[in-house]
From Swiss-Prot:
Any one biological process term the GO annotation gives: NAD metabolic process
Gene: nadK
Cofactor: a divalent metal cation
Name of the protein described by the UniProt record: NAD kinase
Cysteine-cysteine disulfides: none
Catalytic residues identified in the record: 44
Length: 255
């Protein structure tokens, strides 16, 4: 695929900003809203931010690592960028849609590329009832929290919480507890990407819980619904032989 107009975005870190200026001089710099590809210079945080900002445009985004964490980024090189973009492999990502009902009666929605997570707000453990497709699957999970991760997000917080790594082309979501106290041996579940999840907060006034979709947080939630939004396609570009699928496989053999 050949791209005519490239837009460069970068973090405020000196290394990233210097790379943006150098690449802009060499390849030109279109406005993001006029470009047909965006090159993000930074770490995974910038990649997620850029994907959120342009989520509904279906514009391909190619990341190059000028940050600290670069799982979603390609290696930085200033040579042959147009050729790299033309040869890049594309991964299509669908976000999670979270609907949160709060203690004050209000309802809010947010989208997540990596995960939707529920956390206890105080020293009291959270108590959460979990339903899948309208059927209660766990009457009471006593925990620090619980999360739902996409395949793209399964190597992020989900992995740190001992959740499974999910291949990028698997039509699955990972449901993972965070420091489960009861049932102590429950390690979560793999669910169809079409699953509709509902989390009900038990003893909510005594045990307040917040809900976070990537970087969007709502506090004192009473109920949270989560499902994949298949109507939104996000396109990520990766160098051949170093695509997201390969990275996820490699991650499973690190020790």
């Amino acid at each position: 695929m050949k791209f005519e107009k490239i837009a460069f975005v970068a973090t405020e870190m000196p290394e990233a900003e210097a790379a943006r200026k150098a690449l802009s001089r060499r390849y030109g710099d279109a406005k993001p809203e006029e470009a047909d590809v965006i090159v993000a210079l930074g770490g995974d945080g910038l990649m997620l931010q850029t994907m959120h900002q342009h989520m509904k445009r279906r514009i391909p985004i190619y990341g190059m690592n000028r940050g600290s964490v670069g799982f979603l980024m390609n290696e930085y090189r200033d040579d042959n960028l147009t050729e790299r973009l033309a040869a890049a492999e594309c991964a299509t990502i669908h976000p999670l849609r979270m609907r949160a009902s709060l203690a004050d009666g209000s309802c809010h929605e947010a989208l997540a590329i990596n995960e939707v997570a529920l956390f206890r707000e105080t020293y009291q453990a959270a108590k959460i009832r979990i339903s899948i497709d309208g059927k209660t699957r766990m009457e009471e999970l006593v925990c620090d929290g619980v999360l739902v991760a996409t395949p793209a997000g399964s190597t992020a917080y989900n992995l740190s919480a001992q959740g499974p790594i999910v291949p990028i082309d698997a039509a699955l979501l990972a449901l993972t507890p965070i420091s489960a106290f009861r049932p102590r041996r429950w390690r979560g579940a793999l669910l169809s990407h079409r699953a509709q999840l509902r989390f009900e907060i038990l003893e909510a006034e005594k045990r307040p819980v917040s809900a976070v979709a990537d970087h969007t947080e709502f506090r004192q939630v009473r109920e949270v619904e989560v499902e994949e939004d298949g109507s939104i396609d996000m396109l990520m570009l990766f160098d051949p032989d170093h695509g997201l699928e390969e990275r996820i496989i490699t991650e499973q053999f690190l020790y």
